[in-house]
Amino acid sequence: MTKVIGVRFRTAGKVYFFDPLQLEIKRGDHVIVETARGIEFGTVVAGVHEVEDDKVIQPLKPVMRIAGERDIEQEAANKEKEKEAFKICKEKILKHGLEMKLIDAEYTFDNNKVLFYFTADGRIDFRELVKDLASVFKTRIELRQIGVRDETKIRGGIGICGRPLCCHSYLSDFVPVSIKMAKEQNLSLNPTKISGVCGRLMCCLKNEEETYELSLIHISEP
């Protein structure tokens, strides 16, 4: 067994494990950690606990520190910078005449990289755009093309149930959803009834799948 904490970097983002060392870290704390992207500010969603060794990707990186007041202030400043970066990138996309839709801008905590998330129908040659952005921000630039489900997860919204979208609220990862699940639950197969804001089958169809499968088994038993 390995002692870990679970950390998220975005709302309903994937949970990553880190070594808590001897620090007293609890759920809701903010921590500074090193990731493949650089130094980042994360929120603890699972306090110190043990998990099976095969659930941990080695080497398990240690927490650098529990975020202090200065760290929290810097993170807030980064959020403001992201708004400006988004605006500038959108202007540059128009300037270069690229058929891409900008979704979000994100600074790493140490400002060593700015990531821009976008959607597009096909592949985009954004090499000149990257050069232009690098000359403005004087740091590393990464453009990442995402799908419609990821776009909805980032932006959020309200589902047809009247509640905040599952993918933006609590789902860490997308799960496979099939039309078979809607059929087993006797739902209307009208696309407008079983599709989410993203236009894909609603993630919540998966929530009751197991219950319906068990019910069908009991009904079919003599």
What residue spans do the PLM features occupy?
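Ferredoxin-type iron-sulfur electron-transfer modules in oxidoreductases and energy-metabolism complexes
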Residues: 171-191, 195-202, 206-216
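Acidic-enriched and Gly/Ser
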Residues: 1-188
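Residue-level detector of conserved catalytic or cofactor/ligand-binding positions
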Residues: 217-222
